[in-house]
Each structure stands twice: as structure tokens, then as C-alpha cells.
Amino acid sequence: MRTFHRLPRILAITVPLAAIVATAACGASTTDEATAASTPVATAAAPAPVDGADGLVSQNRLGVGAAQTAAQAALAKCQADGLGFVTVSVVDRNGNVQAMLRGDNAAQHTVEAARQKAYTAAAFGANTSDLSERAKGDGATVADLPGTLFLAGGVSVKSASGSIAGIGVGGAPDGMQDQACAAAGLDAIAGALG
């Protein structure tokens, strides 16, 4: 068997094994009986399907129009409050950015802060101001999770199926000001959430 010295160890094992499995699936013989008996082959049994399940998962998501509306309403609220230096981010349940608006005078750090607050709210299904207590304490806490930010300024967007998105605002001098702007974004799309 040819080995791949420059590949990580898992690839050096996986690539030849994949070739053996693929060839065997086509009905061809890949080795003689002696070699086949001494070659370990990993197998995995698929779990039995659940009655009526077809293997697909449906997820509700905000449409691009609703995401833009929420971002615009949140930024408009901040601007009306004299906070034109914030960034607003709307993300889906998995943290993928659906809409982002950066105020004219927003610093670069506000971009990531808004995205992380939005993701935290979406992932936990709660406003980040309510979650901040969970991030306190000695030792490991939820605050150690990558991509999260447990500061006020993120609101969860929910439908009947649960949390589907998050709206985050970053850059105001106080997190509750960020939170008020994010809440204005949520209010702007509340009627579309059903």
C-alpha cells in the first residue's frame, strides 16, 4: 500500500480506505483473501429512520427583506438618539450575517461586536442583557464559547419554532443603548414573524 508522508495521518489512512470501499462498492475485488482478512475496515451502522422522517430538516429563516428592514430600523433608532457611530448586524440562527449596516462614524471594532452579540442572542434564544449573568463566574463559562459576546446589545428574533435570528448593535457608550436600538429593529419586523 502506498503511504502519503506529507499528508496528515488521518488522510494517509482515510484516502486508501476510501479507495478500497469505493472499489468494493462497485463489485470489484481489491485484495486477495489473505490481505482482506488482515486489513481492518471501519463500518458504521446508520440509525433506524424515525417514522415519517425523510432525513431533511426544515428551518425558518428571516428573508433578506426582513433582515434589511430590521437593520435599517435599528440604525435609524441609534441615529435618532445621536448614536450614529454604531454597527447593526442581523444573523441567522447559525451566525451567518444576513444584513449589516455600519454607521458613518462607526469604528472597526463595532462590526465584530454587533455580529457577536447578534449570534449570541440567536444561539441562546435570549437577549444578551439577560444572558450576561450566565457569563460570570470563576473557571470556564459560556463566555468562553468562540464567537459569542455576553454584553447588552443583542436581541433574539423568534418565530413559533423558536429562535431563528439575532439582531446585534455595537458601539454605543452603554450596552443598554445598543439593546434599545436592536429592539427597535425587532419591533420593525414583529408583524412578519407570525
Residue spans for each PLM region:
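Classic N-terminal secretory signal peptides
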Residues: 16-20
